[in-house]
């Protein structure tokens, strides 16, 4: 009986191919690596698990499919290894089996099964010594960091991302390390370490600037855009998102990250629309006051009314245009996700559409989109998206309470639903380390407790304090504004601060006199600031303290945005 023939020479998996693919990953020579794989399409299409280096090639294919190579689906290639002859899989070397688990982990990531993926990567990392391949270990750490980030476990994600970066640096692969730094910068941003996040991201951008790694360069621009949006710099955010879209389009006009940037751009335009709506409302209020004071002066009133109506029409046209453009961006993103299924991305599209419909007063459409977002998120146990959907549903129900819509025989039904959604959002947010998300959940619980049905300012104050503690020193622009809204509502209700009640009865707990004095100053200065028209100079004069101290205390209690340079 003759010896078993090996595959033809052009279908052999030689060490040179694996080395070339690895070098291109390390140097971020993306087009060269993809061209190399395209030239071996026959080899990949006919990949035989019994070949030498088959499992190693599979691991490298997983890396390149993640980068952007559009070869056979990873799950299809893995099935060939599942259908091995009896006993052959068990005869794989430890190194080959680890490579197989690497590929299975990436396949799970593609399916958004993050917990399953983490299990595969934990196995790989537990046998790091047996694998003796720092390149693959660096990738495994990085991939695990990405999974943890999606689950909202930011502290641990940062640890594993740092491990991957250090391994890459140790190998001299500085460009590969820079890719991992982009994720690191986002995680630091989520922890409120904005300056460090920007510094690391800019360093990564400098290292990758001469490469054709357009997806990572797009991710950097997207990161800058999301920072700008969170700070309320919506025009700048749109510029960054447009830049990100340009980068992604160079790699693939239907890239899923391009869809994500379209969804983010829609949210930025929504931010501009909200600012414009506030200006329209302020102008209308000012016009009503002016008209009332000028009664009897018909000529002047008529001219003013015409001017106001003209400005108002222009503003409303611009408002409608912004909302229309936002929905168009979301439709374009939705079309990409239909071709490249992604539950998290599609859920975000539903969410952002719901926000725009809510702003326009279309509660039914908003409710439908928010429910779809939660349903999509629940399928993958995507806690972050589930929390956002529940907060949005809480917002919609509160809007119905204020508009007195559909109360029927039970006028409290919408208020109770709002509270239930808010409470569920808090419970879900505690599964993550997303502090701003938890703060937002507490905020909307407080706004619900303050609505016209519950009218419970004392409970709302507790929620306010929890929200303030959760967002720490770096609230996003929209959360900071909501903090102001909730704080003002609590003050208008005229409730006595629970701390003052307790102190009046001698209940001081373990606090020292100095701590009580500092807390008393926070309470009094915040209330005087509201009474004095939110003017720091008036508070300083009235209480005979320095304006600097007033600003510091207001920032500490969340009544003034930290780092605000506005003088008053």
Predicted features and spans:
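Residue register of alpha-helical TPR repeats
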Residues: 15, 55-59, 99, 139, ...
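Residue at a conserved register position within TPR or TPR-like alpha-solenoid repeats
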Residues: 24, 68, 101, 108, ...
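Structural motif corresponding to the intra-repeat A-B loop/turn of tetratricopeptide repeats
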Residues: 27, 111, 131, 144, ...
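Bacterial C-terminal helix-turn-helix
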Residues: 505-568
